[in-house]
């Protein structure tokens, strides 16, 4: 009788574990699904100077070997956008003022401007920070909450955590206060 109960209990235990294991396996995404999801969050952008900027963006975290250790402002803009033009001097000023702590990456968004015209525009607005061009820009805009209106900017702390989202032109005082606060926390 003891052996029968022991056998029955053991059989019951293994049967329960087997069903649970099947459920866990069924509900767990496959390696290829996880890899695909990860690859969809990796962006390889090219600047007007041909430099590559790579980063991963997922769940309000920005990870990049290219941008590591700095406060990063990702800015979506277009040359035809008046509010975008309004904030460019702010970015240039703060990039010059905090070169070791702060970097702007401007992503050209829905702007069919030629390379020569873009170079002239950047010179006119004294853009001393990278501007990315190319096919991946649209994919980045989709990853950042499917951007539809510009300018739109995202500020990330040195550890890659998003600190602030700006819709419309960025206010210089607000941005500088955030940079100083983050820089001093380092």
Spans of model-derived segments:
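N-terminal targeting signals for export/organelle localization
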Residues: 1-53, 184-186
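Thiol/disulfide oxidoreductase modules built on the thioredoxin-like
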Residues: 123-128, 134-181
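Conserved redox-active cysteine motifs that mediate thiol-disulfide chemistry
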Residues: 68, 76-93
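A short beta-strand-turn-helix
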Residues: 44-72
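Structural microenvironment flanking redox-active thiols in thiol-disulfide oxidoreductases
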Residues: 85-125, 136-141
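Short pre-active-site segment immediately N-terminal to redox-active cysteine/selenocysteine motifs
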Residues: 70-72, 76-80, 111, 149
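Conserved hydrophobic packing residues within short motifs/helices of P-loop NTPase cores
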Residues: 74, 105-107, 154
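Active-site acidic short loop of glycosyltransferases
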Residues: 68-70, 100, 127-128
